[in-house]
């Protein structure tokens, strides 16, 4: 197979991935690439077609996904800052907040409405 260099954009088009994904793959070691000028840290990456194919076929970085495996829900402590909508606690809080918003504003002391 021919071993000519691909730029990062060409490798992204070949792999059908975005440029940030390709850069992340290079940083994590999934895609083998070198800098055009290794002495400069901002030099563009160069890779080969074989390295791109190897990155797609690498079983080290692929994740097996199954719909029903390892479904676990963590039980969390329900405290006032973390209440799921629709629970009795949230209904009580909503009622209290609504009554405080709809109630008459008195600046901390009740006012009399009796007129003389």
From Swiss-Prot:
InterPro entries, per the entry: HTH_17 (IPR041657)
Keyword Lyase: no
UniProt record, GO biological process: DNA recombination; provirus excision
Source superkingdom: Viruses
Keyword DNA-binding: yes
Pfam families: HTH_17
Record-level Gene Ontology MF annotations: DNA binding
UniProt KW keywords: DNA recombination, DNA-binding, Viral genome excision
Its job: Part of the excision complex necessary for the excision of prophage from the host genome by site-specific recombination at the att site.
Protein name: Excisionase
Highest classification ranks of the organism: Viruses, Duplodnaviria, Heunggongvirae, Uroviricota, Caudoviricetes
């Amino acid at each position: 197979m021919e071993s000519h260099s691909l730029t990062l954009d060409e490798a992204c088009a070949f792999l059908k991935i975005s440029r940030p994904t390709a850069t992340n793959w290079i940083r994590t070691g999934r895609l083998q690439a070198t800098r055009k000028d290794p002495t400069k840290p901002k030099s563009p990456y160069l890779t080969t077609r074989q390295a791109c194919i190897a990155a797609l076929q690498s079983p080290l970085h692929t994740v097996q996904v199954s719909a029903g495996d390892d479904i676990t829900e963590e039980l969390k402590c329900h405290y006032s800052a973390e209440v799921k909508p629709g629970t009795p606690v949230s209904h009580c809080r909503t009622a209290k907040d609504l009554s405080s918003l709809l109630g008459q504003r008195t600046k901390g002391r009740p006012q009399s409405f009796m007129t003389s």
